[in-house]
Amino acid sequence: MSFAALEKTIDAAWEARDGINLQTKGEVRDAVEAALDALDSGSLRVAAKGDDGKWVVNQWLKKAVLLSFRLSDNKVMGDGPGTTWFDKVPTKFEGWDDSRFRAAGFRAVPGAVVRRSAYIAPGVVLMPSFVNLGAHVGSGTMVDTWATVGSCAQIGKNVHISGGAGIGGVLEPLQAGPVIIEDNCFIGARAEVAEGVIVETGAVLSMGVYIGASTKIVDRETGEIFMGRVPAYSVVVSGTMPGKPFPDGTPGPGLYCAVIVKRVDERTRSKVGINELLRD
């Protein structure tokens, strides 16, 4: 079945989703399985950059991921000693052997969990972390310890997602577009990016920065305010904006914001650059 035919079948199934269940067979089940396989292999992705440089979201692939929950039952699963789960989504590595891992070309250390339909490119290093279904992780990226990559999130090439950082998903609460981290970005420890925010090429988020769709991102030099995207090559830290005064005129509470303190320079890049030795 061509990708165009898959899209047509899944869009139609989505409109009739109340009638889809564990007993559903035939074209709908085959289309959903084919879509998940294409996401898993990287031949399709939930969002991709168009020729104009703008990101285009393939909503039908999100629908395929969601429909898979109606088509699948919970079952006992486990990939290693002492690991047993009960879920509808198998792990990506279920049944893999040495040759399969070598062909895939990435490293997954003990404790790394990746669900089926997430794509992991060659050269990626997965520390004990979690990558949810439908996500796409580009080559040379490091997902550090206890970091999470949410459902359908798009992570570019040579990105570093530091320990405990969180990249939000799209499935619950349902979001129109996935979080996108473009190439060569650095996401600091315990930082969070959610609600479809786009972090553009080469940006650096400091430790503990939280950015959602409504977070104000203030350029300290110009006063310009961005929302929903972090401009390319920005260095971003946590900050506050003055709040409205109380009725009696006393200062009100300040509100959280993110602050662009500068643009990435060689000094910054030397601190956040990837270590090629870890990717051999």
UniProtKB/Swiss-Prot annotation:
E.C. number(s) listed in UniProt: 2.3.1.117
Enzyme class: transferase
Pathway as given in its UniProt record: Amino-acid biosynthesis; L-lysine biosynthesis via DAP pathway; LL-2,6-diaminopimelate from (S)-tetrahydrodipicolinate (succinylase route): step 1/3
InterPro entries: DapD_Trfase_Hexpep_rpt_fam (IPR005664), Hexapep (IPR001451), THP_succinylTrfase_dom1 (IPR023180), THP_succinylTrfase_N_sf (IPR037133), Trans_hexapeptide_repeat (IPR050179), Trimer_LpxA-like_sf (IPR011004)
A Pfam family reported for this protein in Swiss-Prot or TrEMBL: Hexapep_2
Protein name: 2,3,4,5-tetrahydropyridine-2,6-dicarboxylate N-succinyltransferase
GO MF entry, a single one: 2,3,4,5-tetrahydropyridine-2,6-dicarboxylate N-succinyltransferase activity
Protein family membership: Belongs to the transferase hexapeptide repeat family.
Binding site for substrate: R107, D144
Catalytic activity: (S)-2,3,4,5-tetrahydrodipicolinate + succinyl-CoA + H2O = (S)-2-succinylamino-6-oxoheptanedioate + CoA
Subunit structure as annotated in this protein's UniProt entry: Homotrimer.
GO biological process: diaminopimelate biosynthetic process; lysine biosynthetic process via diaminopimelate
Chief place where the protein resides: cytoplasm
UniProt subcellular location: Cytoplasm
Protein keywords: Acyltransferase, Amino-acid biosynthesis, Cytoplasm, Diaminopimelate biosynthesis, Lysine biosynthesis, Repeat, Transferase
Any one GO CC term of the record: cytoplasm
